[in-house]
């Protein structure tokens, strides 16, 4: 299962580490990361492969959402198929 993780919020040290540690702990492989900072706001989109992971998508979404709340950013996780349909022109 391929996933898209988006992160948005005020920039601070450790955002990427906070997100990627959860993914690594749950055997989710990162395929690509794009991030930037604009006017002090952090934006990241991460593409990942979760076929080797045992965690259910809903549980991973909750862990990442809770981590986002703890560090002051919004983290959304979607199956890539859903993301693709929502962003198709």
Could you tell me what each predicted segment is?
Residues 1-89:
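A conserved regulatory-domain signal marking ACT and ACT-like small-molecule sensing domains
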């Amino acid at each position: 299962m391929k996933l898209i993780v988006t992160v948005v919020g005020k920039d601070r040290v450790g955002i990427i580490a906070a997100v990627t540690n959860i993914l690594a702990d749950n055997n989710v492989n990162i395929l690509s990361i794009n991030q930037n900072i604009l006017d002090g706001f952090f934006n990241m989109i991460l593409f990942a492969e979760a076929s080797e992971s045992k965690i259910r998508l809903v549980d991973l979404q909750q862990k990442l959402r809770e981590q986002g709340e703890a560090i002051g950013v919004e983290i959304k996780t979607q199956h890539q198929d859903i993301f693709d349909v929502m962003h198709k022109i």
